[in-house]
């Protein structure tokens, strides 16, 4: 967005996902259209981005996370990475895998083990 707005010079530092994992679907746009006018949104659909976003959201949902939970996921096209952490920052677990549901379950198990 900053690049398209001509504000790229305002970027002080760009974080890579291995430094700071973003929330699922960060940067993706969603379109809502009236029933019967789905063709309008279809023109803007990028299948690869949609698949990545769906994988990221599946990880977060399997963990049981939401907008306020310390859960993140990122798919760069080749690697799916998920993260779960304690709300107080006392622990953090980052894992990667190919199956979004399995990765989410793994992270949910980690969170449950820390909750005991």
Region locations from a protein language model:
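Small-molecule-sensing regulatory modules
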Residues: 1-116
């Amino acid at each position: 967005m900053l690049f398209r707005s001509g504000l790229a010079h305002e970027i002080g530092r760009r974080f890579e996902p291995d430094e700071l994992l973003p929330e699922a679907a960060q940067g993706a746009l969603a379109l809502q259209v009236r029933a019967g006018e789905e063709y309008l949104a279809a023109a803007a659909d990028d299948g690869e981005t949609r698949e990545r976003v769906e994988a990221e959201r599946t990880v977060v949902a399997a963990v049981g996370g939401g907008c306020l939970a310390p859960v993140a996921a990122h798919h760069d096209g080749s690697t799916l990475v998920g993260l779960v952490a304690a709300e107080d920052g006392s622990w953090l677990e980052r894992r990667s895998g190919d199956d979004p549901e399995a990765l989410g379950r793994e992270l949910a198990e980690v969170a449950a083990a820390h909750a005991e």
